[in-house]
Every structure is written in C-alpha cells, then in structure tokens.
C-alpha cells in the first residue's frame, strides 16, 4: 500500500468562472496540468476527480487516472470527490488539492507530509485566519466518516472536520506562503493571478 496519494478535485461546475477552471490556461499549459506536475513530483500516486462534461478533455491532457464521483454520491461536492479518490487509490494519507489554486508550490506538499502523524485524522492549514480544508491532508480512516455524512445528506467540509481529530497548522508557523492558497473563482481573480505571476 502506498503511504501517500494525491486527490485533485476538478469536478465543480465553475459557474462563477464561466468555463471549466481545470482547463484554464496557465504558464503555457492549464491549471490541471500545472497542479499535477507539482503533485506528481511529491506524491507516489495521484488521481483526478472530474466532471463527466470535461472528463475526456482532461484525460487527453494528463498522465494520471481521471475518474468521476462514485455514482451514488455524484454531485455531492468535495466530500464525494474525496471519498471517490480514497476508494480509487489505497493509501494511508491523502493530500487534497482543488484545481483552482495555481499558485501552490511543490514545497507545500513536503510541508504537509511532514505534519502528518497517526495521532490525527487530518492536517488542515489556517491561512490569514481561515481554515483551508481543501488544501489539506486526510487519513484513510476518515473515509468511513465521509460515507456516514453523505448518507445523512451532509456535504460540508466543516461537518467532516467537526468529527475528526484535526491538527490545525498556522501558515506563519510552517513558513507557508499565503499566496499558495489563493483560489481563482472568477475571471477577475484569474486576470489578477496572471498579473501577479508576470510581476514575479
């Protein structure tokens, strides 16, 4: 069993963005390719959770498995995506990554891995006072908790965290750059992220 695996969440509808964010251009490739390049350099196995509308297009771009949510839980947000990835790859710990945080660094996965221990169910960063449950790590044992929540039609990451023994890590304590955690939700944020990139 590989100890560490990565799950990239690319199944959202990107309604505020106006087109699939996973396929947005970034540094000569796309968000999804850029994020996978970083993750595959740090983790043994990675799977992408995609929406049926873009699955084939994503498969053409990447060299890792691309799957959809488990049919019974399809459309139940990030929890469904996470548990689908956990079922697909057997591992002890899973690093979760949304497809719309293109500033993330390879370094982040190294930091995250170092923070895990069997005493905890999850490791979640707190950046500028906000929890970041989708740029976090979850132990395999969380899978049963997710299934229980989905059975009760509960979909929020907060509900999962409330049932887990979570190690919260403050960004400033672990030398994490707040920019790594910036989500691109709108075209305006996308334009700004590209400007910031060209100014570096």
Curated annotation (Swiss-Prot):
Recorded name of the encoding gene: mobA
GO MF terms held by the record: GTP binding; metal ion binding; molybdenum cofactor guanylyltransferase activity
Source species, domain of life: Bacteria
Record remark on domains: The N-terminal domain determines nucleotide recognition and specific binding, while the C-terminal domain determines the specific binding to the target protein.
EC number: 2.7.7.77
Disulfide bonds: none
InterPro entries reported in the protein's UniProt record: MobA-like_NTP_Trfase, Molybde_CF_guanTrfase, Nucleotide-diphossugar_trans
Reactions accelerated catalytically: Mo-molybdopterin + GTP + H(+) = Mo-molybdopterin guanine dinucleotide + diphosphate
Pfam entry (one): NTP_transf_3
Transmembrane helix listed as a keyword: no
Organism placement in taxonomy: Bacteria, Bacillati, Bacillota, Bacilli, Bacillales
Identification of the protein by name: Probable molybdenum cofactor guanylyltransferase
Free-text function comment from the UniProt entry: Transfers a GMP moiety from GTP to Mo-molybdopterin (Mo-MPT) cofactor (Moco or molybdenum cofactor) to form Mo-molybdopterin guanine dinucleotide (Mo-MGD) cofactor.
């Amino acid at each position: 069993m590989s100890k560490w695996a990565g799950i990239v969440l690319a199944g959202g509808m990107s309604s505020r963005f106006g087109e699939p964010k996973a396929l947005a251009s970034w540094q000569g490739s796309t968000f999804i390719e850029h994020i996978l390049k970083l993750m595959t350099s740090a983790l043994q196995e990675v799977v992408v959770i995609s929406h049926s509308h873009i699955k084939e297009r994503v498969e053409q771009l990447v060299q890792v498995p691309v799957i959809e949510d488990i049919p019974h839980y399809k459309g139940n947000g990030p929890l469904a995506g996470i548990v689908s990835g956990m079922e697909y790859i057997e591992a002890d710990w899973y690093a979760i990554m949304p497809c719309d945080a293109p500033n993330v660094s390879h370094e982040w996965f190294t930091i995250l891995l170092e923070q895990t221990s069997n005493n905890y169910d999850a490791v979640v960063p707190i950046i500028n006072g906000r929890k970041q449950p989708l740029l976090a790590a979850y132990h395999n044992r969380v899978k049963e908790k997710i299934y229980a929540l989905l059975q009760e039609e509960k979909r929020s990451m907060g509900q999962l965290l409330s049932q887990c023994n979570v190690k919260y890590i403050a960004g400033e304590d672990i030398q994490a750059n707040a920019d790594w955690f910036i989500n691109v939700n709108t075209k305006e944020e996308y334009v700004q992220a590209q400007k910031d990139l060209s100014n570096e």
